[in-house]
Amino acid sequence: MPAKGRYFLNEGDEGPDQAALYEKYRLTSLHGPLLLLLLLVAAATCIALISIAFSHEDLRRHQVVLGTAFLMLTLFVALYVLVYVECLVQRWLRALALLTWACLMVLGSVLMWDSLENEAHAWEQVPFFLFVVFVVYALLPLSRRAAIVAGVTSTVSHLLVFGAVTRAFQTSMSSTQLGLQLLANAVILLGGNFTGAFHKHQLQDASRDLFIYTVKCIQIRRKLRVEKRQQENLLLSVLPAHISMGMKLAIIERLKEGGDRHYMPDNNFHSLYVKRHQNVSILYADIVGFTRLASDCSPKELVVVLNELFGKFDQIAKANECMRIKILGDCYYCVSGLPVSLPTHARNCVKMGLDICEAIKQVREATGVDISMRVGIHSGNVLCGVIGLRKWQYDVWSHDVSLANRMEAAGVPGRVHITEATLNHLDKAYEVEDGHGEQRDPYLKEMNIRTYLVIDPRSQQPPPPSHHLSKPKGDATLKMRASVRVTRYLESWGAARPFAHLNHRESVSSSETPISNGRRQKAIPLRRHRAPDRSASPKGRLEDDCDDEMLSAIEGLSSTRPCCSKSDDFHTFGPIFLEKGFEREYRLVPIPRARYDFACASLVFVCILLVHLLVMPRMATLGVSFGLVACLLGLVLSFCFATEFSRCFPSRSTLQAISESVETQPLVRLVLVVLTVGSLLTVAIINMPLTLNPGPEQPGDNKTSPLAAQNRVGTPCELLPYYTCSCILGFIACSVFLRMSLELKAMLLTVALVAYLLLFNLSPCWHVSGNSTETNGTQRTRLLLSDAQSMPSHTLAPGARETAPSPSYLERDLKIMVNFYLILFYATLILLSRQIDYYCRLDCLWKKKFKKEHEEFETMENVNRLLLENVLPAHVAAHFIGDKAAEDWYHQSYDCVCVMFASVPDFKVFYTECDVNKEGLECLRLLNEIIADFDELLLKPKFSGVEKIKTIGSTYMAAAGLSAPSGHENQDLERKHVHIGVLVEFSMALMSKLDGINRHSFNSFRLRVGINHGPVIAGVIGARKPQYDIWGNTVNVASRMESTGELGKIQVTEETCTILQGLGYSCECRGLINVKGKGELRTYFVCTDTAKFQGLGLN
């Protein structure tokens, strides 16, 4: 798994672009809460206007508040329209938020001064300013610091103004009572500040987590698209499209089954990806004189020459609708008519043969190096596909393929040699002459194949004057080595590097990107106006694309309409996931730092307790109820913070498990939340019936102790605002649990609201005189007088007994106020909880998508790794991975590499094409089993140093010693040459595998093996179909050791025999044999019966 810093932006290492994206995201995410606040305030103002209009007969007394409220309503509606216009949000959102706060403060000030027309009370507008304080943190798009400043300013302004005003206008309350009342106001507002700040902190952390996972998900999604495109390009660079998809699915299935090293087929046979095609033409081409040229080349020059030559051939093949099949040393063969049949397949191949002959002719004339092209073509049927499990190479098999190979061997340098079957498909498009191929190849004579040489139409035209085709005549040029002259000339052709196409910009798809809110975004335009240094880097281009996609995702995450927008992930009318099982998974997600939510709720309890202690009568029921809740919350907190006590107790693991269960166990967390929130909502109101019920005693009875009476703020009705504020604090405590289920939160708040409204509206304080027919004003006067008479004289202000209160506006306004603010806070918290629940679900959704896409990305990485390692050795594949891939040719020289060729000669006799074996397909199925079993041996740790190079028909080529470059001269002889012994052991394991296949298939195949060691050159050639290969005299001699060997034996050269004998192997001298191109060589057979017991150097 790649490191986090490699693929993702770290939270603490954000660049300017990332910081700007986060700022844009933060403002966008706060867009919806501001709209919600403006909508709530506008609705509340409208309701307040209506209630004042219908509850007061004389509206002239409230002209100021009515005018101000109407003006504020107009402003809030205007602000809503401005905020809704999203183009204004980014620049003016903070200004609009501050303007909204200022309007709320103005409205609160007007309401305060309006109350001075009656009797002033310290509890006036406390719920309103508590609402302002809470929404400053929860709904206004302000920074944490700005929100704290605004909240504290709102608190201090209310306390200072009402403290001064109440002291000046209040005549019925002592200084002690006024001080206690103002102190209770401070506790309420400070509790709102702290709870709001905690709520904002939690919400910002959750919002940042959502942003981080959104960025990660988009980055991984972009990388996934790149990986998929690279995977397709890589697979198509090795295999044709009609075969690659099936093999790709097989690789993914293999990874799911537990990795490539533990893969076992589902049946007795390995998958066979071979198809039969008819009416195709096969072209074989060999560079005559290349062996002599290659011996003079340095490793880099050899790789450059092969890449430039075969790159040019690939271009010619593409222009002539031919598909290159494979490169075998300096041999190049291709087919026309694959995978789609072409009526012009013969003409295509002939045209290509003439073009490559002309290309080599230009090289010869420009450099003076004696090389030419020999081309053979035959038309017929082929079986094409891939066999084996490792180092896939697209190949073709059939008798017609073998005949085409023979046509090349029997051809004439510089000419195109074709069979009569190909001539019949040319439709006289080219003139030909008799080829006499049967005179140069006995197989053609035996099969009575008539051959022809194609006459190049260009040879009949006068040669154009072209100075660059003339043979070099300068002395300096002639003194250059032939390889240097050829290399310099071929470099001017500018062939593409292997795998260069994998990092092209066009490989990144910019198709439509699904966003989680259900809206499908348009294709993201690729930025081309960036600075060259940024756009030149694949990493920079990837970051640009991620920024573009992130901007689209931010628009999709806009919370303007989360409740009503159509989504592919959520139900239309409820925050429930559509995906089956994901709803339960979401509810089981652990909640980190959940214990701090309980700590904040406990602080709200402390605020409610202080308010009751300051302004409520001190009765036994108050102590009992708050004592029980305090014990309960203490138990909950000890449960949540059990790890903090682990140092003091030996059972540390038990305490840690208890504490962690709060975050990881939903049922435990649910029980604790219900107990905590339920106890707070209950304790806020449970004492009200006892406090406000005057009981059977008469008004003149004084059964209240002086201490209790001293702590009363006034009449029972005047206690209602503080019970209301306590209930509101209980509501707010419910909001600190951000991840609480919306249904549970709504249920608790709804039950509490109904109970509160019933208790407040049915309170006895509204019906003190029972069925009395007195006016409300008289009831109010009697209530106030009776209550005043029941208090000790030292607690009343001078003249209080003689002062009669004003008419009974208080009762009516208190009732409206209680109902209004309870419903306002309820609606605010329900809508806010709905929005928070949406974002919590969105956060969980992005995390799930990130996890899923990250797993898919890792799968793609593994698939790409397997694909690349199926083309190249692992250490070579690393050269082509990353941003610097394909910047240079890959080549490497080795001093001591052991090369093995192992063939099954009897397979050529076994292979037949008839209806019984599906025209040879079943024969290839057996060959596929043989090669696949050979490949499975490579997975054993013992043979980890053996590298399969390729298969040539029924010949298996492998090498050992390629995993590390040259430079092991200081090692002892046994360890330096241990890989030679490993390859011999591998050869014997191949023989053993073949014997097992013979037993199951009732055949008698025998392996013929040739081994040689020495210096080689390794490299990757071919841009369209990159191929790893090795070259050198060592490879040629190893091939001759196989072709001149005997069945069931391993033939080695004299030098290799000496090394093997030093490693403890026994060898038998065969004697001198004639080897093509090498003359007579003394060779040896490795004794396979005793070698496995005498391999001393393999441990």
UniProtKB/Swiss-Prot annotation:
Residues 456-476, 504-543 are annotated as: Disordered. GO terms for molecular function: adenylate cyclase activity; ATP binding; metal ion binding. Residues 519-531 have a biased composition (Basic residues). It catalyses: ATP = 3',5'-cyclic AMP + diphosphate. Residues 508-518 have a biased composition (Polar residues). CDD domains: CHD. The chain crosses the membrane at residues 34-54, 63-83, 95-117, 122-142, 147-167, 178-198, 596-616, 621-641, 670-689, 719-738, 747-766, 813-833. Binds 2 magnesium ions per subunit. Is also active with manganese (in vitro). Phosphorylated by PRKCD. It is found in: Membrane. ATP binds at residues 286-291, 328-330, 374, 950, 1029-1031, 1036-1040, 1076. Gene3D superfamilies: Nucleotide cyclase. It comes from the Eukaryota. SMART domains: CYCc. The keyword Electron transport does not apply. Keywords: ATP-binding, cAMP biosynthesis, Glycoprotein, Lyase, Magnesium, Manganese, Membrane, Metal-binding, Nucleotide-binding, Repeat, Transmembrane, Transmembrane helix. Disruption phenotype: Knockout Adcy7 homozygous mice die during embryogenesis (more than 93%). To obtain adult animals with Adcy7-deficient immune systems, the hematopoietic stem cells obtained from the rare adult Adcy7 homozygous mice are transplanted into lethally irradiated wild-type animals. All chimeric mice survived the transplant procedure and appeared healthy. Adcy7-deficient mice appear to be hypersensitive to lipopolysaccharide-induced endotoxic shock and display a higher mortality rate. The protein contains two modules with six transmembrane helices each; both are required for catalytic activity. Isolated N-terminal or C-terminal guanylate cyclase domains have no catalytic activity, but when they are brought together, enzyme activity is restored. The active site is at the interface of the two domains. Both contribute substrate-binding residues, but the catalytic metal ions are bound exclusively via the N-terminal guanylate cyclase domain. Belongs to the adenylyl cyclase class-4/guanylyl cyclase family. This is Adenylate cyclase type 7. It comes from Mus musculus.
